[in-house]
Amino acid sequence: MPAQLLDGNALSKKLRAEIAARAAIVTAKGVRPGLAVIVVGDNPASQVYVRNKVKACEDVGFHSVLEPYPAELGEEELLARIATLNADPAIHGILVQLPLPEHIAAERVLEAIAPEKDVDGFHVSNAGALMVGKPEFIPCTPYGCMKLLESIEYPIRGARAVIVGASNIVGKPMAMLLLQAGATVTICNSKTRDLAHHTKDADILVVATGKPKMVSGDMIKNGAVVIDVGINRLPDGKLCGDVDFDAAKYVAGWITPVPGGVGPMTITMLLMNTLEAAEKASKP
């Protein structure tokens, strides 16, 4: 029997309705949630992601500012613009779309964003707060993954969770969230020996490597929840994840589709973080 789908589009629709309702309340108090999105260069994937984020803001009643810059933009110019946005009371969240051109140090840029406006949750102070279980903002993709697990009331406490991919954006914060929810967590990376030995033991398997279909069906435990964070374009133009969906769906109990799984949830949790930043700003 095929796995049940963890439908990110359906859950996003429900959550965005709640976000829009809360945004209307805070806007009525004179604080309209505002998000500034900065994109440097003309990376086609970045352009698509940015357009989707701006449209999502408009759909829930947020004020959004899209700031596109040429790839030649200097690092100091970008830092100066971030400083201006940090001081702008109409902006509650600042997002710098990654990747940045090679001449710009992404770490320096991300740490220039005021922590209270760091709605991506990448600032070192927010990462540290997450580590000790007191997050200001949870990184959007792991946050969305946790919401998907919550939506099926999955019993995380005591479960064996395996994360393939150890990035600061997904793997590490995902591990912290699952650990805090009571799971026993293993993080695998490119140096991990016998990856299948670990993945086949996972009740919850989260894959975020950027490698198309690298996790095959025979690497998955029967009945596992499989969350595929990857989105890759194949030579024929089709999109696929980091998991071989067609094989995995006959082994897993639950699985996220690609597209339509984690992707829409990432944007939805960006909206949630921006809303919460605005709600905090509205309090006297």
Curated annotation (Swiss-Prot):
What does UniProt give as GO cellular component? cytosol
EC number annotated for this UniProt entry: 1.5.1.5, 3.5.4.9
Q: Which UniProt keywords apply?
A: Amino-acid biosynthesis, Histidine biosynthesis, Hydrolase, Methionine biosynthesis, Multifunctional enzyme, NADP, One-carbon metabolism, Oxidoreductase, Purine biosynthesis
User: Which stretches are annotated as coiled coil?
Assistant: none
Question: Could you tell me which pathway this protein works in?
Answer: One-carbon metabolism; tetrahydrofolate interconversion
The lineage's top-level taxon is: Bacteria
- What InterPro entries does UniProt report for this protein, alphabetically? Aminoacid_DH-like_N_sf, NAD(P)-bd_dom_sf, THF_DH/CycHdrlase, THF_DH/CycHdrlase_cat_dom, THF_DH/CycHdrlase_CS, THF_DH/CycHdrlase_NAD-bd_dom
The answer on whether this UniProt entry bears the keyword Transferase reads: no
> Which catalysed reactions does the entry list for this protein?
(6R)-5,10-methylene-5,6,7,8-tetrahydrofolate + NADP(+) = (6R)-5,10-methenyltetrahydrofolate + NADPH; (6R)-5,10-methenyltetrahydrofolate + H2O = (6R)-10-formyltetrahydrofolate + H(+)
Q: Sorted alphabetically, which Pfam families does this protein's record hold?
A: THF_DHG_CYH (PF00763), THF_DHG_CYH_C (PF02882)
Could you mention a single GO BP entry for this protein?
A: methionine biosynthetic process
Q: Which GO terms describe its molecular function?
A: methenyltetrahydrofolate cyclohydrolase activity; methylenetetrahydrofolate dehydrogenase (NADP+) activity
Identify the residues that bind NADP(+): 165-167, 190, 231
Protein family membership: Belongs to the tetrahydrofolate dehydrogenase/cyclohydrolase family.
What does this protein's UniProt record list under function? Catalyzes the oxidation of 5,10-methylenetetrahydrofolate to 5,10-methenyltetrahydrofolate and then the hydrolysis of 5,10-methenyltetrahydrofolate to 10-formyltetrahydrofolate.
PANTHER family linked to this entry: C-1-TETRAHYDROFOLATE SYNTHASE, CYTOPLASMIC, C-1-TETRAHYDROFOLATE SYNTHASE, CYTOPLASMIC-RELATED
Q: How does it assemble?
A: Homodimer.
- The name of this protein is Bifunctional protein FolD
Organism per entry: Polynucleobacter asymbioticus (strain DSM 18221 / CIP 109841 / QLW-P1DMWA-1) (Polynucleobacter necessarius subsp. asymbioticus)
